[in-house]
Amino acid sequence: CHYKFDKFIEEVKSGMSVIINALPAEYFAKDHVPNSFNLYYKTIAKMSVKELGEWFSEVIKLHYPKLATYIQNNKLQIYEIPIVTYCAHDKCNASELAIKELMKKGFVNINEYSGGIVEYRKMIPVDK
């Protein structure tokens, strides 16, 4: 599923979806959506299912208290967590490749914000 800007912002604010920037770390360091986490698609490909599950578990434990509660109460498994990926812009395919890699590892609830950081910054400029 491809999210439009408004739906993406809704997901970011909800605290109920893990927001993943699928670009290399140097691009993430230059600019990223607040409250998103860098997980380059090539890194996902190299991680084992166990490592990826542990990575998401740690991020959720530290930054997503609502999701952590659902997991603790067995209402949600780690591989069912809502994830939204994004990359640079609508011509970039890193977020799509991240989705494919996540699905190969058993994650089932993944969406994409295809506008990427370029569209995001058009809508929400950086304060100078």
Model-derived features with residue positions:
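Catalytic cysteine-centered active loop of the rhodanese-like fold, especially the PTP/DSP P-loop
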Residues: 55-120
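Mid-length scaffold segments of soluble, non-membrane domains
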Residues: 18, 22-51, 55-56
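Active-site neighborhoods of enzymes that stabilize oxyanions during catalysis
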Residues: 122-128
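Short coil/turn linker and secondary-structure boundary residues
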Residues: 3, 44-47, 115
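Flexible, polar/low-complexity N-terminal or interdomain linker segments that lie immediately upstream
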Residues: 1-33, 128
